[in-house]
Design a protein with these regions (language model features):
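N-terminal acidic leader/helix
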Residues: 1-23, 41
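Short, charged early-sequence alpha-helical segments and their helix-coil boundaries
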Residues: 36-50
Length: 50
Protein backbone atom coordinates (compact mmCIF):
# COMPACT_ATOMS: atom_id res chain seq x y z
CA UNK A 1 0.00 0.00 0.00
CA UNK A 2 1.37 3.39 -0.89
CA UNK A 3 1.91 5.85 1.98
CA UNK A 4 -0.85 8.24 0.92
CA UNK A 5 -3.47 5.49 0.93
CA UNK A 6 -2.07 4.16 4.20
CA UNK A 7 -2.39 7.60 5.78
CA UNK A 8 -5.99 7.88 4.54
CA UNK A 9 -6.86 4.51 6.01
CA UNK A 10 -5.11 5.40 9.28
CA UNK A 11 -7.12 8.59 9.64
CA UNK A 12 -10.36 6.77 8.83
CA UNK A 13 -9.57 4.05 11.36
CA UNK A 14 -8.89 6.68 14.03
CA UNK A 15 -12.15 8.45 13.19
CA UNK A 16 -14.04 5.14 13.36
CA UNK A 17 -12.42 4.24 16.68
CA UNK A 18 -11.06 0.99 15.23
CA UNK A 19 -8.06 0.26 17.43
CA UNK A 20 -6.83 -2.81 15.54
CA UNK A 21 -6.87 -1.09 12.14
CA UNK A 22 -5.33 2.06 13.65
CA UNK A 23 -2.40 0.07 15.01
CA UNK A 24 -1.99 -1.86 11.76
CA UNK A 25 -1.96 1.21 9.52
CA UNK A 26 0.33 3.02 11.94
CA UNK A 27 2.79 0.12 11.74
CA UNK A 28 2.60 0.14 7.94
CA UNK A 29 3.20 3.88 7.80
CA UNK A 30 6.09 3.59 10.26
CA UNK A 31 7.74 0.92 8.08
CA UNK A 32 7.35 3.15 5.03
CA UNK A 33 8.91 6.10 6.86
CA UNK A 34 11.84 3.98 7.99
CA UNK A 35 12.49 2.90 4.39
CA UNK A 36 11.70 6.10 2.49
CA UNK A 37 11.83 8.78 5.17
CA UNK A 38 9.13 10.94 3.59
CA UNK A 39 5.57 11.52 4.72
CA UNK A 40 2.81 12.06 2.20
CA UNK A 41 1.20 15.49 2.05
CA UNK A 42 -0.92 15.23 5.20
CA UNK A 43 -2.88 18.41 4.49
CA UNK A 44 -3.87 17.16 1.04
CA UNK A 45 -4.98 13.79 2.43
CA UNK A 46 -7.13 15.46 5.09
CA UNK A 47 -8.69 17.76 2.49
CA UNK A 48 -9.58 14.75 0.34
CA UNK A 49 -11.28 13.09 3.30
CA UNK A 50 -13.37 16.10 4.28
Amino acid sequence: MDPTECLKQLLLAIADGDKDDTVGYLQDLTEWLQKDGALPDVEQVVLELT
